[in-house]
Amino acid sequence: MEGSGTENPCSTTVGWLQQDNDAKPWLWRFSNCFSRPQQTLPLSPQTKDYMENKKVAVELKDVPSPLHAGSKLFPAVPLPDIHSLQQPKVQLSTVPKVSCCAHCTNDPSTSPVRFGGGSGGGAGSLVPPGALLDSQSTRTITCQVGSGLAFQSAPPLQNASARNTLAGVASDFPSMCLESNLSSCKHLPCCGKLHFQSCRGNVHKLHQFPALQGCPSSAGYFPCSDFTSGAPGHVEEHVSQSELTPHLCTNSLHLNVVPPVCLKGSLYCEDCLSKPARNSIIDAAKVWPNIPPPNTQTAPVTVPLCNGCGTKGMGKETTLLLATSLGKAASKFGSPEVALAGQMLENLPPIGVFWDIENCSVPSGRSATAVVQRIREKFFKGHREAEFICVCDISKENKEVIQELNNCQVTVAHINATAKNAADDKLRQSLRRFANTHTAPATVVLVSTDVNFALELSDLRHRHGFHIILVHKNQASEALLHHANELIRFEEFISDLPPRLPLKMPCHTLLYVYNLPANKDGKSISNRLRRLSDNCGGKVLNITGCSAILRFINRDSAERALKRMENEDVFGNRIVVSFTPKSSELCETKSSNATADKVKSPKKLKNPKLCLIKDISESPSSAKAAPGKGSQANSGSATRNANVKSLQELCRLESKTGTRSSEPQQGHLRLGAPPHRSSSAAAPAPKAPGLAESVYKTNPKKESLGARSVTSSPVEKKEKEETLFQVSYPSAFSKLIASRQVSPLLTAQPWSSRNLSPNLLNRASPLAFNAAHSSVGADGPDPFAHGVDVQISNLDYRLSRKELQQLMQEAFSRHGKVKSVELSPHTDYQLKAVVQMENLQEAIGAVNSLHRYKIGSKKILVSLATGAANKSLSLLSAETMSILQDAPACCLPLFKFTDIYEKKFGHRLNVSDLYKLTDTVAIREQGNGRLVCLLPSSQARQSPLGSSQSHDGSSTNCSPIIFEELEYHEPVCRQHCPNKDFSEHEFDPDSYKIPFVILSLKTFAPQVHSLLQTHEGTVPLLSFPDCYAAEFGELEIVQENRGGGVPLEHLITCVPGVNIATAQNGVKVVKWIHNKPPPPNTDPWLLRSKSPVGNPQLIQFSREVIDLLKNQPSCVIPISNFIPSYHHHFAKQCRVSDYGYSKLIELLEAVPHVLQILGMGSKRLLTLTHRAQVKRFTQDLLKLLKSQASKQVIVKEFAQAYHWCFSKDWDVTEYGVCELIDIISEIPDTTICLSQQDSEAMICIPRRERTQDEIERTKQFSKDVVDLLRHQPHFRMPFNKFIPSYHHHFGRQCKLAYYGFTKLLELFEAIPDILQVLECGEEKILTLTEVERFKALAAQFVKLLRSQKDNCLMMTDLLKEYAKTFGYTFRLQDYDVSSVSALTQKLCHVVKVADMESGKQIQLINRKSLRALTAQLLVLLMSWEGTTHLSVDELKRHYESTHSTPLNPCEYGFMTLTELLKSLPYLVEDQVFTNDKTEECVKLTSLYLFAKNVRSLLHTYHYQQLFLHEFSMAYSKYVGETLQPKTYGFSSVEELLGAIPQVVWIKGHGHKRIVVLKNDMKSRVNSLGPSPASHETQPSAPERILEVPESPPASELRLGVGGDGPHPAEQELLRLTDDSPVDLLCAPVPSCLPSPQLRPDPVVLQAADLIWFEEHPQEPSEIMILNQEEKIEIPVPIRNENLPPDPSSPGVSAAVPAPPSPSSETPESLLSKDPTESPAKKQPKNRVKLAANFSFAPITKL
């Protein structure tokens, strides 16, 4: 620096800053306040000419004007020549400009001050540091205020003008703000930090500039007075608080202060004032002590130092003290900062923004944050924000928009969208409140187009004097526009906002409404829809079923209506509103995202990983990129070239584009995981300068896992493949991630559980993906653009569809907006639903929260479905992989693959979709067909045997022959091989002969394990006989053709835990399955092979192999004979290509769970595996045991029983073992058990004694089976469909343990009279028995004929109408008939055939009332006391003899009386059973046995009535035991009596309730038995006395008087029947006989002899004996020769039924009771008649 000087800069003072000695401290010369532009600033002698510059780069028009008051005080003072100050605008230099500290020396770190802002030597002059203060002349200099922090500044703005960037010129105006570049002075600027460390010389005191008269506290400059010499020290020790200058902002970024902020005469920028003070107030007493304080009485206010926006200081920054002179203390505002802010806000006019966001909504694809920012930038300058409010229905508005408004601190007022003008009323109220709160001047910004605001705007403008700014749409009314001061079109206002989504395309104005109630008339629904959409101008076009169509005048109205109407209630249904009809939703989804549906606002990306994209070069701004193909900032990521320093900086980064890059460079991408999950992502990057507009037309909602490259050329494919980034995702959404790939072409690994390691399936693991090409992903539609589908299963089918939809709507709406809820029909008895949510994040949250959430009585299963077009492809990819992974070499012919696919998944395959799965499969032309192959990158590691085996040791037990990764193994054991010169190359595999041995597995198994132990776990199969002979002796080998032996290789594989593997050199090796001995307690079944999962053709082939080999001798067949044997057995060719194989050996190796290949070379043998043999033997053994009557067989008799059952000799080698016990021991104990019985081993089926409850449940199950099969075609169904059908039909699970069984087949066998199990090959068919089939067919015929006119049908039309009614054809052969006429003969109890003129006609028979028959049969059964049960034939005879009419069940609709009785399950116990005499018998249930006792009890009472509260005691005394209703399943006596309505009924109320016997039960047909109590307590009488009658009823005591006509007995006073041998009145009265209660009846009797007896008594008669305990009248027949001397003897009082009288006298007809006495109006049943009308009631209490 040539102009640098070494003189102390503080030795002299500047002249114009120097005071006169005689002047007062507060007097200044105003002429010294301005520097003359004509004079140059004198410099030190070392200063060169280039330091002189007479031009100043400041124009007056660029400087804020000083205060008007101050300018008027000095009118005579000439201002400097402004024109001389002007100079051309000079572009800023790219070199950072710094300011010079005038108090510092020319330190090497200090740069010279450049005046004029020029970049060249002539454009400005440089002033060396220190030279400013050396001059003795009176010139002006300015000390800039800046930060002492030195670092490289940001690149300068390219459009900045020179007039806004002064470098260091002294200002002539005290209130102007100067630009200040960051200071590089390490000592800090003099007005900045006050702690100087290296100041040399004297410290200068800066005196305050005298204030203008009009503005006493105006800011001024301070002269540099004489500093006291000394060492550098703290300036603050010499400066008083009152001498601190007000803040002078010199920040170049703060020159936008228009109008300037004037605070008591000082000018501040708003940015500086908005910053809080960082330090406390400095002690005023220690600062500027020699300068008197200013003339003010107010406390100083601290103002933060303008340190440059966006920069930070290095330490404690000094605050500037500002004195106020208006006489108001700032302390009343609290802190000084609050006081300053309050003063500032008082001087700014308020502004309020009122936004009708439903009228002027945030445009699609734009952010609400950008709109709010635009409003504030446009209108808020010079104002203070007093109100910013928007009104909307937050449940209808986009949640992202609401969140953005909240983030912008905008008041969001919620209103009900369906209420008319709710938003307008709320805004009008807010406008009125604003006018009441604030006064003019104030500004109101209204964002709306509604004319309803015209009145409020008029008052605000004309009465309150507010400034009105109206932001409106094009269709605004003139009445509204007239009242605004400023008009701004809303479309223009937001037109240049950067779009974040594709621009909205024109669309229809129709809205489709779904889920309308079907039970309401169309007019009501139309009125409701019109009310919902009236505010938006909607019109209901038509209503069809559950949907409707509404029309709107424009798209905006339709969108508003969709928000308001979505999920609204219409007569109990939550409606679904859409722009597209349901039939076209799929097509619309596959088309462009912006064509048919409303483009949703951007969603916040909830990516748990933060993407840091580094070193991505800039793309050319002029690139003609299609939408989605340009450079784009990825959501949740930031782009920059420098290192990212903080997360806050990362969120503020912008995407940069260069202008010189012609070939974009491929950068390296990496995904790094932050320590915690972020619930929100960084804000979208704003539009960078020069970025093409097409870049913003992409869809940022696309969430691509692969980073999108900025290039669109396919040449760089290799570069992209090298660019990987790693992502961690929860394993539950692994398939979802695959669906979100940009393109399936670049997927590195498929999403399949077969090729992922366990740690990848069980936790979130990094998975590698290829970086996707931007041009590839941009063309495909966004999978979740139109919503995300959530699949729900395990729904409660008991709920109605409407309830399910409503419950799911409520549950899912708590986690986000639900677009639709759709229920699928019942498919395989599974009810499923699909809930469509608006975005992916809400769907994931719903899945996490609602999985296994209980709806109804079930816990739903929730899973996430993939989206839109990729949904079907992702599903197809998974389905394809599941098929091909089970195919040989992962390939199948196309036709075979198509067949397998359609059979497995039940829907057609579109072959063209296979060509789209380029990352999963490849379709190759092979010969005359095409081959579908799984790509190596997608398939799991396959062993040579196919996918059923894996290479880990834990699953190598899938086959006895396993190809394992044994690199090499010796073909023989060198230790025990007799041929020491054995050469592997000379060995001929065809020469190997398979040995057949006879060994017990019980002995052989431990020997094999011991042999493996001594041979380190492996023994070559060729040397196994030699090694075994060396250890245990020679094997017992038999000839193959002689039989009786088992192949040694097969017997080895029968040992649990041992297998035979094949090394890579083809040598078979005997080894342990897990390369170690099995644990001693291991279940052998855990060590067996397992069936393959997948290919149904291979499963069918395995069944055929079993069927073929079990018919071969010893189940062994040479491999060369397999094809001819197959052809002969199945009468069809075994086409290997049909299964996708090219060689037979490959097909045979594909079923290792059933087929074992023995030997080697061309002489290999085929046999069944031990697992298949055990399963086969188990089935045969169960069939054998079930054929036995006792379900068991003695081991010694097993061979004979086997021969009887299967018609062939028993040979244990047929099942691959040598002893029966070897294979029986393999069967689980729950299937077969061995027991000892009389020193004999017994094989039996384990049977648990079922409880009575289980038996009862089984009976009910049989009824359920009948009900279920009656709904099936032909009353039959497949065995494997029973469980799902039962679950669907009855709504409950069929639990076998509930019935006491462990297998379903056993349960079916327990109901053989109901169900038959037919075996058709491998399939089982369930069908009803013949009797049940006819009963079901009869019910169908009744239904069919009743639906016809006149209940008849022509015989020729029967089969046709049957098929039409029931949906399937009628098969006569199922009923063993050949014609309909023969069928009607078997259904004679239902239909009859009538000959008509037109032909034979089938008619329903007229059935008799079954109710009356039921009552009659019940009376018979209750009257029967002979035995506990009664035969059906005897019951029929008894009925016919009693009612003198034949009992024909066909008249009642039943084929037999047995079937009729079975239809009365509540009356008849066990329905109908067979006794020892093979007779069908029947007995009453326990409940009706109780009813029988109740009937007998009520018969002992007058009128057969009894009070309810006395019933329990009377019953207990009558029966002899306490009545317990709970034993019958009831909680009270009243409920128990109510369960037998056929017997009794209860009438009355309260305590007057009476138990009354039904009229049908009053007839005493054969009431011959005694009471139960007497029958139990008294000894039996001699049989000849107590005879059980066979036919007519016996004589009984008859009470009552009256009759239909004259009768001789009416004249009797008291007598017995004619055959009575005893005079009762003359006999001694028994002591147990109580006195009767005689109540005279007021009937006038004729005079007669009251005591007249017969002269000639008859032989037998009846006496009435009262039971001593129960006091019940019991008629007992007495014969003369057997009459005891004491009538009270036990023999006489025995309570047994009495025989009828042998007299030839016919029993008299029963007499009628007086109608006034008995409500029953029935004839009396007593033989003993009283002349007087006495009520003979028994005494129950003594």
Curated annotation (Swiss-Prot):
Annotated region (Disordered), positions in chain: 620-642, 655-721, 1678-1729
PROSITE patterns from the UniProt entry: HTH_OST, RRM
CDD domains (UniProt xref): LOTUS_1_Limkain_b1, LOTUS_2_Limkain_b1, LOTUS_3_Limkain_b1, LOTUS_4_Limkain_b1, LOTUS_5_Limkain_b1, LOTUS_6_Limkain_b1, LOTUS_7_Limkain_b1, LOTUS_8_Limkain_b1
Residue spans of biased composition, Low complexity class: 673-689, 1703-1712
Quaternary structure note: Interacts with LIMK2.
Function: Essential regulator of oogenesis required for female meiotic progression to repress transposable elements and preventing their mobilization, which is essential for the germline integrity. Probably acts via some RNA metabolic process, equivalent to the piRNA system in males, which mediates the repression of transposable elements during meiosis by forming complexes composed of RNAs and governs the methylation and subsequent repression of transposons. Also required to protect from DNA double-strand breaks.
Name of the protein: Meiosis regulator and mRNA stability factor 1
